[in-house]
Amino acid sequence: MKQYSSACDENRDPILAIIRREFADARRILEVGSGSGQHAVYFGQHLPHLNWQTSDLPGNHASINAWRAEAGLSNVLAPLELEVTTTHWPATRYHGVFSANT
């Protein structure tokens, strides 16, 4: 079930301007709380040099995967199950961490 967030559409361009600069030399980014999946897909389209690792609670995975499937981007990865207060963080090394609207 693909979810939609108007907040993602409203803030994606200002956020993109910042992360384009801050993640210019990065390759692997962990998004904490990917929510609907809109930001992941939008940033993946505009920043193809990044491997964007989505993550969220299992209840949001279907929406994240629906946005990923529609976009067909190989650099936006399937969501990890991540509950920041109770689960272990991924062992993979990331060059940056992103979170918005969570």
Regions found by a protein language model. Give the residues of each.
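Class I SAM-dependent methyltransferase Rossmann-like catalytic core
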Residues: M1-A26
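Short alpha-helical
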Residues: E10, Q38, G59
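Structured loop/turn residues at beta-strand edges in well-structured enzyme cores
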Residues: A24, S74, T92
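Conserved class I S-adenosyl-L-methionine
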Residues: A26-G35
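Class I SAM-dependent methyltransferase SAM/SAH-binding core
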Residues: L30, V41-T87
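A short acidic, Gly/Pro-enriched loop at the edge of an enzyme's catalytic core
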Residues: W89-V97
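A short beta-strand submotif of the Rossmann-like class I SAM-dependent methyltransferase core
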Residues: S99-T102
